[in-house]
């Protein structure tokens, strides 16, 4: 994916860049695979904010993605189109199965219009094919990996991400995650060969606040500039530093959010490397 830089005709354009969408072959989605998508503004069913800084944004329709592919084993499918999906960073591929059904999948790097893909234990090891981990050779780069057999892909679904199959030990496969964490996964889980496409998406510069508003992101306001009624760090005479350890607007101490002693931690072989550049 190529990135186009704008000429500095305005302050907002000066720092902006945009995808060239060179891989996209069709601009209109498959109507039968669209669903309505209502906005929540970051609120739950009680109206309470559960995700801050969300709201507004362009209207979207959800594209139904097939993250399982286990009910199409042995049925060949042809890639009809590569399409843009506003709901994720990766592009999506429209498959026309030879039995007449149409489905979307995450578009891996190198998958082009007209390519024939397959799923099942006997599928070839080529980009876009979906197989159980026990049938994939060690060292293969994969994406769209399941955590539980038949539950659908959960790992390595965003643009440019991938997982490496390091080995197999009994009923488990050893995987290296995008975070460098090494963990065990049930060998019956399925994965797709290759890495997710659209890897240059991370290099796009949005350039101005307005483009983030189009995406549904609202401004992030620091607690120390709020009033005491709005945030524990608010108030004070003049400019202050907050006067306490960093907390959320609801008083929750800032820091690690990963749940300790989670049942799936038993499957971790080696923790991810710490980010040395991150503030302590």
UniProtKB/Swiss-Prot annotation:
It holds the Pfam family Ribosomal_L2_C. Residues 1-20, 29-58, 225-280 are annotated as: Disordered. One of its GO terms (cellular component) is large ribosomal subunit. One of its GO terms (molecular function) is rRNA binding. One of its GO terms (biological process) is cytoplasmic translation. Keywords: Ribonucleoprotein, Ribosomal protein, RNA-binding, rRNA-binding. Residues 45-58, 270-280 have a biased composition (Basic residues). It comes from the Bacteria. Residues 253-269 have a biased composition (Basic and acidic residues). InterPro entries: NA-bd_OB-fold, Rib_uL2_dom2, Ribosomal_uL2, Ribosomal_uL2_bac/org-type, Ribosomal_uL2_C, Ribosomal_uL2_CS, Ribosomal_uL2_dom3, Ribosomal_uL2_RNA-bd_dom. NCBIfam families: rplB_bact. Belongs to the universal ribosomal protein uL2 family. Part of the 50S ribosomal subunit. Forms a bridge to the 30S subunit in the 70S ribosome. PANTHER family: LARGE RIBOSOMAL SUBUNIT PROTEIN UL2M, RIBOSOMAL PROTEIN L2. This is Large ribosomal subunit protein uL2. The lineage of its organism: Bacteria, Bacillati, Actinomycetota, Actinomycetes, Mycobacteriales.
């Amino acid at each position: 994916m190529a990135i186009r830089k704008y000429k500095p005709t305005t302050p907002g354009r000066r720092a902006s860049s945009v995808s060239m969408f060179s891989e996209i072959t069709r601009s209109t989605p498959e109507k039968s695979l669209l669903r309505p998508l209502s906005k929540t503004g970051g609120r739950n069913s009680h109206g309470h904010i559960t995700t801050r800084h969300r709201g507004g944004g362009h209207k979207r329709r959800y594209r139904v993605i097939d993250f399982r592919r286990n009910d199409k084993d042995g049925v060949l499918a042809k890639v009809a189109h590569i399409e843009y999906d506003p709901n994720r960073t990766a592009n999506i591929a429209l498959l026309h199965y030879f039995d007449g059904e149409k489905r979307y999948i995450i578009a891996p790097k190198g998958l082009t219009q007209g390519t024939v893909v397959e799923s099942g234990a006997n599928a070839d090891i080529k980009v876009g094919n979906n197989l159980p981990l026990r049938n994939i050779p060690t060292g293969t780069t994969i994406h769209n990996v399941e955590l539980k057999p038949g539950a659908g892909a959960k790992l390595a679904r965003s643009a440019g991400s991938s997982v490496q199959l390091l080995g197999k030990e009994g009923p488990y496969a050893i995987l290296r995650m995008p975070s460098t964490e090494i963990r065990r996964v049930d060998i019956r889980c399925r994965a797709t060969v290759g890495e997710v496409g659209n890897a240059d998406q991370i290099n796009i510069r949005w350039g101005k606040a307005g483009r983030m508003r189009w995406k549904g992101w609202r401004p992030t306001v620091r607690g120390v500039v709020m009033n005491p009624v709005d945030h524990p760090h608010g108030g004070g005479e003049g400019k202050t530093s907050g006067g306490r350890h960093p907390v959320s607007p609801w008083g929750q101490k800032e820091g690690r959010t990963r749940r300790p002693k989670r049942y799936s931690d038993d499957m971790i072989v080696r923790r991810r490397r710490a980010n040395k550049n991150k503030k302590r």
